């Protein structure tokens, strides 16, 4: 053998030995296996680990309950686990088994994560920590972990070890009872968000409850009260309804042109429902409807709001899983118990895109409300509302409202803003002339697209849901019975429509 080759082989063998000795090196400090074995008084590696998964939106609740249960033992300990990233990739059982041969998991400080518990509040929750305490007189060890999709862990979990399997089962039964007893989500306004790794990894966002009065919502007389009575008033008489065997769950569909006040009406409902849990879904978060319905059932009385629900009928590939999202919504609305105090509030700009099963089936949607374009009196009220604190004269407000027929609430808000902007550019106080100049500007022929973006199409239309003028495509529609009303005609190809009369194709 060549002398250089022999030396290379010897050097390489020494390198392998050094690498292997590094793997077998014992980490300094008290080891995980030793600690749990001493606490349970039996070899920890011989015990079965019981895993309890916790949804991402309930992790703060789980942290609160774990702290309560551990604190009942005045001698409890909370410790962390060292060992670098390996601890994130291995289960508690794996760590204990590996520690028999390669003790690489010394005790350290717990890992924490800051999580919201309200619009302006946060809690420091245990992200990775080992609870050592006695429950009902028996020692228990619980490893608490938050969800970490980047390490392959999609949900938070508790990994429970006890000397006797019954002790572990009793502890988890008590943990579940306390989780069902209450939640930091109850009575809050929250929206479900999509996580980077899919719906199951998403959490919740807390929102401050809106502060609105009936005078802040300008709708035709009696319309707002009708919606509020159905969404909120029924719950006030739940005992009477239950006594007569009538269901509490209800569905409300708010439909109409964009910008007419559907979302503002929802905000009013939220403002008048203090103490009621509200779950908001829109856009991508509509894929979490099943989860939202389960939360609403657990946290009732509650309201589930689905914004722009026509999207789920328009795009059947929207949902995650084998079922189209539309059918998930139907199942969620129809799957609740009759005594569940849950209100579903759906909004849509395109009622013709919703299938008959969603719009007409009793128990799913039992109140459909057309939120129309504001008439003259409503337009006066809208300009007055958005001009609070601005010295417009009543005559100027009426003139502006009269000249903006066929426009929406969003248009009225933009009209007042334009008047203020013009005054700022002129360097003068806001006056009637600025308001009327803003009317001239927004109603000019060159601002057709701007008016359309504010939900205000050409004036005119029929009794039903307003269509959009201009060339378009036919609406899909369904045969009667349905929602009648010719809408606003356009030169496009007419569609079969939703109901006996139908809609013109949207522009």
State what each model feature region is.
Residues 62, 167-175, 265, 292, ...:
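Hydrophobic side chains in well-ordered alpha-helices
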Residues 214-395, 469, 474, 479, ...:
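Walker A/P-loop NTP-binding motif of AAA+ ATPase domains
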Residues 361, 376-507:
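C-terminal alpha-helical "lid" subdomain
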Residues 161-162, 370-371, 401-405:
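Short, glycine/charged-rich beta-strand-loop motifs at protein surfaces that mediate ligand recognition
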Residues 74, 78, 183-187, 239, ...:
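Residue-level signal for secondary-structure boundary elements
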Residues 66, 175, 266-269, 292, ...:
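Aromatic/hydrophobic pocket-lining residues that form π-stacking "cages" and hydrophobic walls in ligand
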Residues 1-236, 249, 466-507:
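AAA+ P-loop ATPase mechanoenzymes
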